[in-house]
């Protein structure tokens, strides 16, 4: 469900009407992701005097003007900086990786590479920081970003999918509809 709707299972759709935390007994839930608007507001408070621009739902910027500033954007709405960005902080990396789809890693890497391509080269001082990626395990999409090697990632994914008989190595059909 959306932010205004009831809490429900992302797999089966079952609505949870009486959530209780098994650790503390609390009943309140909060969003796991803050969102671009709130992130921009918090960065504005953390860095007073530094312009903060936001690009995403409602207003997508094509280009930002030169000069020091913080730019917060949603994936796919990254504006171009004329001299390239000094850095890209890829927030909530886990959120893209934790989606219930076979393509989650591919999609995460595609979005990260698109954002990273807007950053100055490392030789020019550019930096890319994936924040919120799991650190307790190796994550191939993050490794591919750090290595700047999407071909390695694609070959690895294809090998695994062949071994497991998953697309694109095999055909798969999904049937959806109301229960009879």
Where are the model-predicted features located?
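Inter-lobe coupling/hinge segments of SF2-like helicase ATPases
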Residues: 1-176
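Short, conserved charged micro-motifs
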Residues: 180
